[in-house]
Amino acid sequence: MSRVAYQGTAGAYSHLACTKVFPDWEHLACDDFIGALDLVSKGFAERAMIPLENSTAGRVEEIYRLIPRTQLFVIAEHFEPVNHCLLALPGSSLDQLKRVRSHPQALAQCHQRMINLGLKQEAAVDTAMSAKGLAEKGDHTVGAIASSLAAELYGLDVLHENFQDVMGNTTRFLVFSREAEHQPYDAEKRYMTSLLFSVRNIPAALYKALGGFATNGVNMVKLESYMDGGTMEASHFHLDIYGHPDQPAVANALEELRYFARDVRVLGSYPMHSYRKSAAFV
């Protein structure tokens, strides 16, 4: 059976994403992100499902430091709607709760709701671990923020669904593989391309490196800087663009990037997820 690795405990949102994209695969829980990526690098799993950013809490900082250190490829993206649930032990009421435990990202996404209810926030390793710990300790004054899948797995009650501060909360995942998956350009499809590059720390270096995307009409949808090598110079970048390298405009833009930048590495080109085809991305 094929295997997909994810960070977290069974019932985590990464696990939920795995059940959506790879329902018939074995889902391998890992303690951390590098563990999930290493399973793929070493051939113990075919894929890794890794969260990159959330529409409410922003980017997952650690991932940008890890991606350049692997030799893995991005073969797909997945957008998972986040329905945070406030969980409690069976028979517990909201009035009994004093503290709520969850992953820091989940706490940030439900921050205002908990302030309004006067609940103290406590960080946990991940959302599902907070649910599992709640089930094991049996404290009726403690709640957890996790998925409905976690509630089902650990026998907890759902006191509130959609507990997040902002509706439409969504997490973007990237699917990593040890082998590149070259998908020839199909004019009937829309594509994303993800890549890494570096520039010298001099005036206009980034401007020149990215100029080709503007002159060739290629839309850049994400540009993130990250530190590397123990320096404080943010001259390393992760870039997502609309398009496929087999398209002339994209090919020309990448050629200009390679001229002005260094260490250009295309992580992968993959079909655009249907979430991007909604009105918000048109």
Residue ranges and their predicted role:
Residues 1-282:
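Domain-level signature for soluble enzymes in the chorismate/prephenate branch of the shikimate pathway
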